Amino acid sequence: MFYWILLALAIAAEITGTLSMKWASVSNGNTGFILMLVMITLSYIFLSFAVKKIALGVAYALWEGIGILFITLFSVLLFDEALSAMKIAGLVTLVFGIALIKSGTRKPVNAAKEATHAAV
C-alpha cells in the first residue's frame, strides 16, 4: 500500500509541475519555473521508489496516463484550452489502455515456488 501512495504522490507532483510550467509561461516571474523544477524532481523521486514494488510498466502507465488526463482537464479549467471531441476520444482510449495494462499484470512468482516447480 505504501508504494501505491508513493505513486499517487508522484502523479500529483507531476501534474502540479506540468501545470506550473504552463502557469510560468503565461505569467511574469520565476516562481512557476521554480515550482515546476521542484515538483518534477519530486515526481521522479517518488516514482523511483514506487517501482521498487510496483511493476514498472504499470507504474509508468498510471503515472503518465493519469497525469495526461488531469493535466488536460485542468488546462481546460485553468487556462481555457479547448477540449475537442478528438481529445475526449483520446482520453477515453487512454483510460481504457491504463485499465488493460493494470488488469493484465501478474504478480511476480516467488523464487521458492519456481525452484519447486522446476524440480518436479
Curated annotation (Swiss-Prot):
Major localization class: membrane
One cellular-component annotation, GO: plasma membrane
Pfam families: Multi_Drug_Res
Species, as recorded: Citrobacter koseri (strain ATCC BAA-895 / CDC 4225-83 / SGSC4696)
Gene Ontology MF term list: amino-acid betaine transmembrane transporter activity; antiporter activity; choline transmembrane transporter activity; spermidine transmembrane transporter activity
GO BP field: glycine betaine transport
Database matches in InterPro entries: Small_drug/metabolite_transptr, Small_multidrug_res, Spermidine_export_MdtJ
Domain of life: Bacteria
Subunit-structure text: Forms a complex with MdtI.
Transmembrane regions: 1-21, 31-51, 54-74, 81-101
Alphabetical list of PANTHER family matching this protein: SMR FAMILY PROTON-DEPENDENT DRUG EFFLUX TRANSPORTER SUGE, SPERMIDINE EXPORT PROTEIN MDTJ
Keywords from the named record: Cell inner membrane, Cell membrane, Membrane, Transmembrane, Transmembrane helix, Transport
Annotated membrane topology: Multi-pass membrane protein
Cited function: Catalyzes the excretion of spermidine.
Compartment(s) of residence: Cell inner membrane
Family: Belongs to the drug/metabolite transporter (DMT) superfamily. Small multidrug resistance (SMR) (TC 2.A.7.1) family. MdtJ subfamily.
Listed name of the protein: Spermidine export protein MdtJ
